[in-house]
Amino acid sequence: YKGKRVRVVFDGIYKNSRIWCNSYHIGKRPYGYTQISYDITDFVQFGAIDNEITVRVCHTDLADSRWFTGSGIYRKAYLVVEEQVHAVWNGVAFNVSRADEQSAAVCADAEIVNELDERVIGTLTASLKLCGSDEESVVFARVPAAMEAHEKKTFYLNGMIGKPKL
């Protein structure tokens, strides 16, 4: 994964968590019901060396939650590997403004960041895939994209999908 961005994601840690990557403190969260994500690229060691993610939880309050009375990592924890030009974490939103049996008008707002030290030019493609389906993704929009080094920009992609599954 050298040359790419590496992110660690926790879908749930309860509560008052502090997180380290290879002894570098990367963040803390005072509560525990929301997903947290940290870019750990600058702390990861590439090659044959093991990496270590450490999570510390401090739950000194007794029975302070009606939903979860335990402590620790209680949902998925995983790594995400991204290209140097990528969507900002949770930075893509889809909207269907009109739909009938024949077609659907689909919009996507995508916040993209260029982590490179150089300008990039390309094409941004938006597609959808029905969850749990073996069908191919349906491309509904393509736009030309140019971004300066370290720029963050929102792109608006609008298109149509024929015969949507309503």
Region roles according to the model:
Residues 1-89, 115-116:
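Accessory beta-strand-rich segments of carbohydrate-active enzymes
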Residues 21, 104-146, 153-157:
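Beta-strand-rich binding/interaction modules
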Residues 34-38, 151-159:
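Short strand-edge motifs at loop-to-beta-strand transitions and within beta-strands
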Residues 44-45, 100, 147:
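Hydrophobic beta-strand core residues of beta-sandwich domains
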Residues 59-60, 159-162:
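Short, charged beta-turn/beta-strand-edge "cap" motif at the junction between a beta-strand
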Residues 72, 162-166:
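Terminal connector regions
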Residues 84-117:
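Surface beta-strand/loop "capping" patches
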